Amino acid sequence: QSETGNIETYLNNIIDNAPGSSGNQYTAPNNSQLNDWNAIIDFLLDHNLASARTKANQLNYQVTEFTDTSISPNQIFYVLEKESTSPNYWGTYVFSKTPVRNNLIIQAPHIKYDTNTGKQAVYCFKNTLARAVFLSGTHRCNSTNFSSCSGTTSVCSSSSQSYKTSDMAHNVTTMFQKTTENLFSNISNSVFIQLHGFGKRSSDP
């Protein structure tokens, strides 16, 4: 599959249509799926789209070769995204074919809530031509299940509770974490920048 246009517009549309704080659409991948996913990332880093697409299809994902015609010269991106009917909301992972900053990876684990951080990550990715950008697949509170993270938060309820499995910053058995580990191992001197937001209290300056 191939697309042309503006990568920022394309990814912002994915963010806008991602599931919100309710619905329980996020399901955790199993070990076999995590291993298959790791192979997909290997193929993408090697620019082997045919093998990446074959393996991605088995997980109800697809690889879109996206040509951004708003950049001069035009830039090609590999977009690993869920198929439209896929039940697997594991996130969207975009790789630059010819990055300017080969070791820079930008991440947005809370595309819906920390407000605007998903779209800010996309903007930074496009304008730096970083190696990759990771976008979570749902609102951080989408799942009803809790992760094994030792911390607690009140972000999903009025009282403090454990983090949800749909919170990519607080769950290590995810495609988000697996992709992070892969790129950390395979890209020399890799730098990961993860965008977060914080609430402002009336007492804050």
For the regions a language model picked out, list residue spans one by one.
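N-terminal catalytic or cofactor-binding beta/alpha core of small enzyme domains
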Residues: 1-205
